[in-house]
Amino acid sequence: FSSRLNMNLREDKHWAYGAYSFTSGALGQRPWMAFAPVQIDKTAESLRELDREIRQYASGQVPPSGEEVARIQATEIRSLPGAYETGRAVMGTVGGMVRYDRPDDYVFERKARIEALDVDQVKRAAATIDPDKLVWVVVGDLKQTEAAVRALDLGEVRIVDADGQPVTSPASM
C-alpha cells in the first residue's frame, strides 16, 4: 500500500484506487509488471507518471531508501506464515521449491535471506530494468484514450480486440 507508485497515483494524485508492481515467478527471465487501474480521463497522465517513476528508479536518480527496503522486508516476513496455513498453500510452497530447484531447507532460510537484503542489492536489481524495453498495455475506451496515449510516444501502438486479435480499423470498435 505504501509503494512509490501507489503513493503517487492514489495518495497524491487521486487518479487510482491502487498502483503496484511485482515480479512473477518463472524459470529464466522473470516478468516484472506494474498495474495502475486509473480514471479514464487520467490514463495518459498516469502513464507519464509511471514512466517517470520507473526511469528514475531504474537509473538510480531516485534510488531505493533504507526505509523502503525495510518496509518491504517487514511485509515479506509477515507474509511467510501464510505459506503454510492451508493444504493448498503448503502444496504451492513445495511446488515452488521443486520448480525452482530450491534446497530442502529453503523454508527455514527464507526469513534470513529476506533480512539479509540490502539497499545496494535492490539498486543493482533496479538497474536491470530497461524502461525503453517496457511493453505498455492500456485497457479502456479507445476513443477517450488513443490520442493522448499516442502523444506520449512510449513506442509502437498496437490495437487489439477483446480476443487479442489485431484491429485494422479502430473506427469499427
Regions found by a protein language model. Give the residues of each.
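M16 family metallopeptidases and their MPP-like homologs
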Residues: 6-119, 127-139, 171-173
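Proteolytic maturation boundary segments
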Residues: 119-173
